[in-house]
Amino acid sequence: MELRDKVGQLPFSPGVYLYKDSGGKVIYVGKAKSLRNRVRSYFSEDKLGDIKTGTLITEACDIDYILVDNEKEALALENNLIKQYKPRFNILLRDDKTYPYVKVTNEKYPRVYVTRRLRKDGAQYFGPFFPANLAHRLVHFIHRHFQVPSCKVDLTRFHPKPCLQFHIHRCLGPCVQGLTTDEAYAAAVRDVRLFLDGRHSDLARGLRARMEAASLEMRFEEAAGLRDLITTVEEIEERQKMAAAKGDDVDIFAVYAEPPLVALNIFHLRNGQIVDRRELFWEDQFEYDESLFLSSLLKQIYLDQQFVPAEIHVPVEFEDLEALEELLTEKRQRRVEIRTPQRGQKKALLGLVETNAKHSFDARFRVLKPSSRAIQEALQDALNLPDAPSRIECFDISHIQGTDKVASMVVWEDGKMKKSDYRKFIIRTVVGNDDFASMREVVTRRYSRLQEEKQPMPGLVLIDGGLGQLHAAAEALEAIGIADQPLASIAKREEIIYVFGQEDEPVVLDRFSPILHLVQSIRDEAHRFAVTFHRSLRNTRQLTSELDAIRGVGAKTVQKLLKEFGSLERVRAATETQLATVVGRAAAKRVIAHYTTVEAAPEPVASVAQSEDAAPDVPDPQA
């Protein structure tokens, strides 16, 4: 049966429809008050003229549907099916930022800890929390007052003695037989769940009953501890009431779009204060409709998230707004309103978020060329430097298992790389694989020379590496009497920037931050330059050592071959005619004879430090 014929047989009831391709894969999920009317609209001339709808109908070979009682049920089912199938024609939430939850595990002795990954493992997840450190503060409070741990000790068996957490009263000690009972531990976990769920009155009531029972049984120390905990819980409840009176929890959404490119900003207000901001981006919204876009996103965000704010502010209304409000109200068990503010402070806040969405779009999608001074000031602010750095010198070490050790220094100055100032170093004093010692040597040589020549220091010295390399560079500068030199390192993979003197507060920039991209690009250029020099040095050593073993081939001939062919492999692959054009027919015959009649001799270890002695800091010949 043709797809158009199937449409005529759809009911007029509310439900969810699923378009499928020729392989039976779900490519689009939608909902409707009337299935037949909604699906039939896809075949109108106006709709088929859209790129997205036209492509969808071209690829769709079949349609399934599920009937529900009302639009609210259709909305919830649509969201679940989108999560399950991830259809490529639906607008999918791609969040680059994850927020922490507090997890209560599903174990005999549940543990409590912070996680950013939600799993279907039977555990309870509370959150997400804004700002992120709130989750860690809550878990610390739970350890201190409820003594439910987050440790990774195997709790499926007993251990001979408890860990430090038990002795400092942060754990009930379920890992050691006799320290607690199953009932006492289960009661503590119930208290934790009530606390995290915000049911402070219920928690205080239960604690008070246990306090009175302990007092009657003359367990006075336990009763005193419960009394103190009741006081703490009631104080928290009172603070929350006062905060709620000052301002509600609100999420504010704004979008800036130049289809197919879209930037979304979400501001999170908690107790009337802005506590966090999220940025999301799309590059595939060719048929962008702001109402449909926001409707789809709000369902994906809030139907899958435990916390729902009292108000959600959006720039435009959308079709299923009331149904979504009802669902979220049921989920929150308190009234949830989705509004489009028209005046006053709420309208002004929405305008602020819209401005930020436009800036996010520009930063992500436009080719911006800020002034050199603006870049320097942004870098100064991000790394908390004393001055805006107009010149950055970046170092990297390269070797293979401690052999052919070299270093590079590249220079960024006034907004661009300055290749004429690049330097490369052959490591002289370090034996074996010791990157820290190599970094000390190179930094010492570079800045001792600047001191001798009375040259100014750069605005920032950047090291490719982690804390070890950073401290090695700092030790080298201190040893030659250079103090207060701005110094930082960027660790590979984690992309965390450490600033010397501020190591306890590493700089973690957004992965789309232009400052992070700048630091990464300088670091990557230093790495490229070091690896290129290392490879060249290794090839030179291999080529020289092997060709020197050929009878009748002198040093000048070797240098000609090296200059022309660059590597041993290319010399081996060259024909006699190709070799003869470089070194003459007689030498070419000797090279060919060597490779056709004699096995290559083992490579002797050759010293290459002499070239470095002549020129300690060698400018890049390609610059």
UniProtKB/Swiss-Prot annotation:
UVR domain residues: 201-236
Major site of localization recorded for this protein: cytoplasm
UniProt xrefs under SMART domains: GIYc
Superkingdom per UniProt: Bacteria
Entry's Gene Ontology molecular function annotations: DNA binding; excinuclease ABC activity
Subcellular location per the Swiss-Prot or TrEMBL entry: Cytoplasm
Keyword DNA repair recorded: yes
Region annotation Disordered: where it falls in the sequence: 604-623
UniProt entry tagged with the keyword Chaperone: no
Keyword vocabulary terms for this entry: Cytoplasm, DNA damage, DNA excision, DNA repair, Excision nuclease, SOS response
A Gene Ontology BP annotation from the UniProt entry: SOS response
One GO CC term on file: excinuclease repair complex
Domain GIY-YIG: 12-91
Function: The UvrABC repair system catalyzes the recognition and processing of DNA lesions. UvrC both incises the 5' and 3' sides of the lesion. The N-terminal half is responsible for the 3' incision and the C-terminal half is responsible for the 5' incision.
Subunit structure comment from the entry: Interacts with UvrB in an incision complex.
Family (UniProt): Belongs to the UvrC family.
Name this polypeptide is given: UvrABC system protein C
